[in-house]
């Protein structure tokens, strides 16, 4: 059997009364107030024999240290002593009288009499724990559900309605709270064993006011088209007359017994490029040559000259009789067009 050792409070009283440890003494013996030297080990002048004998004696008393066998560890001795002091219910520290810094640091403690000791909390029986658990379990159920099993928000919504129709989904019982549309009296059905839970369904007629939809609350708004967008649209989109005129040139062709519609060679280039026609009409000194390519090439600065093919059409708005050379590249036409446009803009 393990040897019973003395508890910490009587052991401390014995150490104080022995007067063998420097700095450990009574401040007020009647009130059981005493001080313990508590100098930090990192301070200059700290000594094991002078500043840590109380902690070493407690380690020997608890069997954590044996002189000549174990290696001295003052830090662990002090930590174990502090934990033991804090765990005692009948000893408390007087913090306003303690000095924890400096070479003469110490802590002041007071031994509480029996009347001032805190009473131990008794353990609760199993029946008390079960009753408390049931009470905690029932509280959220009662607070979150109403009579019909609906939460408070839903029940408030249904109570605010003027007329309700209660429908039981299990036994098909209908209790109508208003007369029928033909003016007949109210019909009531009595059942011997009505169910406990009923589903509440709201039924509305065509005469009832329907809630406003999102489109009625927020009408659709279309911002006006800017002048820039209008001018761009008129230049790029052909009119209805131009589309109708373009559709008149469709011809039927029969290839290998199959019918096809074709307008090759019949379409007017002014309808194909309405934006170009508008662009050319405002420039009297501009002449644009349109050519068809069998194999389009990528747009770059090194365009080869076009082969000698007859020009399909020449669009000109000027009355001048000047002629252009047949071999004129597209890059030169675009460059000239940009030069003319820049000159007209600067002159304006």
From Swiss-Prot:
First-listed, main subcellular location of the protein, grouped into a coarse class? nucleus
Q: Where in the cell is it found?
A: Nucleus
Q: Show the InterPro entries listed in the entry.
A: Interferon_reg_fac_CS (IPR019817), Interferon_reg_fact_DNA-bd_dom (IPR001346), IRF1/IRF2 (IPR017431), WH-like_DNA-bd_sf (IPR036388), WH_DNA-bd_sf (IPR036390)
Q: Which residues carry this modification: N6-acetyllysine?
A: 75, 78
Biological processes, Gene Ontology terms: immune system process; regulation of transcription by RNA polymerase II
Instruction: Give all cystine bridges in this chain.
Output: none
For this protein, the record's CDD domains field holds: IRF (cd00103)
Cite the residue spans of the region called Disordered. Answer: 117-137, 311-348
Q: Which residues bind DNA?
A: 5-113
Provide this UniProt record's keywords sorted from A to Z.
Answer: Acetylation, Activator, DNA-binding, Isopeptide bond, Nucleus, Repressor, Transcription, Transcription regulation, Ubl conjugation
Annotated cross-link Glycyl lysine isopeptide (Lys-Gly) (interchain with G-Cter in SUMO) - which positions? 137, 164, 291
Compositional bias segments (type: Polar residues): 314-323, 339-348
Role, per record = Specifically binds to the upstream regulatory region of type I IFN and IFN-inducible MHC class I genes (the interferon consensus sequence (ICS)) and represses those genes. Also acts as an activator for several genes including H4 and IL7. Constitutively binds to the ISRE promoter to activate IL7. Involved in cell cycle regulation through binding the site II (HiNF-M) promoter region of H4 and activating transcription during cell growth. Antagonizes IRF1 transcriptional activation.
The UniProt family comment states: Belongs to the IRF family.
Subunit description: Interacts with CREBBP in growing cells; the interaction acetylates IRF2 and regulates IRF2-dependent H4 promoter activity.
State the name under which the record lists this protein: Interferon regulatory factor 2
Origin organism is Gallus gallus (Chicken)
């Amino acid at each position: 059997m393990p040897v019973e050792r003395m508890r910490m409070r009587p052991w401390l009283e014995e150490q104080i009364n022995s007067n063998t440890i420097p700095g450990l003494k009574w401040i007020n013996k009647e009130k059981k107030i005493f001080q313990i030297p508590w100098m930090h080990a990192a301070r200059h002048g700290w000594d094991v024999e002078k500043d840590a004998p109380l902690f070493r004696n407690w380690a020997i008393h608890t069997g954590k240290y044996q002189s000549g066998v174990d290696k001295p560890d003052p830090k662990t001795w002090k930590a174990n002593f502090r934990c033991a002091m804090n765990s005692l219910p009948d000893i408390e520290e007087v913090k306003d009288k303690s000095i924890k810094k400096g070479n003469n640091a110490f802590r002041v403690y007071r031994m509480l009499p029996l009347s001032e000791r805190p009473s131990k909390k008794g353990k609760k029986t199993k029946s008390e724990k079960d009753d408390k658990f049931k009470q905690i379990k029932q509280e959220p159920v009662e607070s979150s559900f109403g009579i019909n099993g609906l939460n408070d928000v839903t029940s408030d919504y249904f109570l605010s309605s003027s007329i309700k129709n209660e429908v039981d989904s299990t036994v098909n019982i209908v209790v109508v709270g208003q007369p029928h549309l033909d003016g007949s009296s109210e019909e009531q059905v009595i059942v011997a064993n009505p169910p406990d839970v009923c589903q509440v369904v709201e039924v509305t007629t065509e005469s009832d006011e329907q809630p406003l939809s999102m489109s009625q609350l927020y009408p659709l708004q279309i911002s006006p088209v800017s002048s820039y967008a209008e001018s761009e649209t008129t230049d790029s989109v052909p009119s209805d007359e131009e589309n109708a005129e373009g559709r008149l040139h469709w011809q039927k062709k029969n290839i290998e017994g199959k019918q096809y519609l074709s307008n090759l060679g019949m379409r007017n280039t002014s309808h194909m490029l309405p934006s170009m026609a508008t662009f050319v009409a405002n420039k009297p000194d501009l002449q644009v040559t349109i050519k068809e390519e069998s194999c389009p090439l990528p747009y770059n600065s090194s365009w080869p000259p076009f082969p000698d093919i007859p020009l399909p059409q020449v669009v000109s708005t000027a009355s001048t009789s000047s002629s252009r050379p047949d071999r004129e590249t597209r890059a030169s036409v675009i460059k000239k067009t940009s030069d003319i446009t820049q000159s007209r803009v600067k002159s304006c």
